[in-house]
């Protein structure tokens, strides 16, 4: 995701500022599936520290703003580590919505 944040790999961006980038997932799991990432590299939720926690807060501010377009609700997921299903070693939040979502996570 660092290459996407740097503009080296294209993405269908839906939001961008100096700290955060949001773009459509290339393999959507819901009618709306957006990934929200800090532009600065943070490997996973396990790596959040006082030095980078403002980036996480900004990600959630963006999630809240994007969520306004989903008035019937949305889900936010972040996988941390291989057993949780994290396949890209860059902190990211899945914003899922646009229709009924399964109640079960697996």
Regions found by a protein language model. Give the residues of each.
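HIT superfamily nucleotide-processing domains
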Residues: 1-106
